[in-house]
């Protein structure tokens, strides 16, 4: 897990906590192709009126607010959840992208990194998987949107938290391919090397081989 640090400005969170950590809240950034580093830099500036403990993308994670402090990631005037609040939770933001139809999605490597981070926090604070929530579950906000639009994605995420090893990543279309591999895969698609371009079924290792072979 490639962890970086870029602390949020002190005007964007509360120092300390009033309750022990019992929940982990999963968010998405609602941006198109942003990075954990970019978000870390943004929230290091004053008066953003929001924050999260971690930002995750496909190749690294940025710690923005220390876990001992209270990030402003799930506050609201009204709550759907009876107990989860900013002061007893850790907020994790997944960087997002848009497909060719303008719909948000979370890259599979970003999901994998988020799973790894969440598992570590579950173990560290003895948190039940049942207490890993979407922002939506806490306040009703449509976040993370892909995990609300497609409930199966959220169910899969929760299932992966309970597994000892994260399942093998599979890429099924060009939008899911990380930027470093898109050019090589697109060349193969253009040459009609795939019978079904929307069902590529490429593993991470297969993708690396394609790039290394310089297709």
Q: Which residues fall in each region the model found?
A:
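Basic/polar, cationic surfaces and motifs that engage anionic cell-wall
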Residues: 1-7, 17-18, 95-168
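Sec/Tat-exported extracytoplasmic proteins
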Residues: 28, 65, 122-125, 161, ...
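Short coil-to-beta-strand
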Residues: 83-94
